[in-house]
């Protein structure tokens, strides 16, 4: 009797595929919320970053703002676009919880998740390179580190990278989970 069950692939203790996919869909929704909070916080933190040095003269003021560098502007725009996508994908994720056997919706999410992963990775990596230069400088190119003077500015731009890279990690997990759920269905 047991050999027949093994040969047919039927087991009494196995979980139904719909139940496992529902759990994946719930985790998908939670991870999307985590990524939304991280990317939105990163965009807000970077977008509101500025610092003016206290020893400004009558004619010269030393000020650092995020939009002084196009890389930081790209970082903010990339995080806002990804946050908007995550907000718009939440209803689709809820539909996947209710109807966990929806293959087409999951494929659409994988495609757009991959595009958003690429955008977010590009923005976070470019900003990380500039943050590194702000902290360390580059003596060969005569780029001096500015973080000794603009301490608060550097702390904020460094902190804004954390949420963005958390978003990158979450997108990788989302893509792997969705691909795994699709492969179990076939």
Curated annotation (Swiss-Prot):
GO cellular component annotations of the record: plasma membrane
Pfam (any one): CASP_dom
Membrane topology value: Multi-pass membrane protein
GO biological process entries: cell wall modification; cell-cell junction assembly
Cytoplasmic side: 1-25, 95-106, 178-186
Major localization listed first in the record, in broad terms: membrane
Signal peptide: none
Keywords: Cell membrane, Cell wall biogenesis/degradation, Glycoprotein, Membrane, Transmembrane, Transmembrane helix
Glycosylation sites: 50
InterPro entries (alphabetical): CASP/CASPL, CASP_dom, CASPL
Family to which this protein belongs: Belongs to the Casparian strip membrane proteins (CASP) family.
Protein name, entry field: Casparian strip membrane protein 5
The organism of origin for this protein: Ricinus communis
Lineage, opening ranks: Eukaryota, Viridiplantae, Streptophyta, Embryophyta, Tracheophyta
């Amino acid at each position: 009797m047991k050999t027949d069950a093994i040969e047919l692939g039927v087991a009494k203790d196995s979980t139904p595929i719909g139940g496992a996919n529902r759990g994946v869909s719930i985790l998908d929704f939670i991870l999307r919320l985590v990524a939304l909070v991280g990317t939105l916080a990163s965009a807000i933190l970077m977008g509101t970053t500025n610092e003016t040095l206290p020893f400004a003269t009558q004619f010269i003021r030393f000020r650092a703002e995020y939009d002084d560098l196009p890389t930081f502007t790209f970082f903010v725009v990339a995080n806002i676009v990804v946050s908007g996508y995550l907000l718009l994908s939440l209803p689709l994720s809820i539909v996947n919880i209710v109807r966990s056997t929806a293959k087409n919706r999951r494929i659409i999410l994988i495609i757009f998740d991959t595009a958003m992963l690429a955008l977010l990775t590009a923005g976070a990596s470019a900003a990380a390179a500039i943050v590194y230069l702000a902290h360390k400088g580059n003596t060969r190119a005569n780029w001096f580190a500015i973080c000794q003077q603009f301490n608060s500015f550097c702390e904020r731009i460094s902190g804004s990278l954390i949420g963005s890279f958390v978003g990158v990690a979450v997108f990788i997990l989302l893509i792997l989970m969705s691909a795994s759920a699709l492969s179990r269905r076939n």
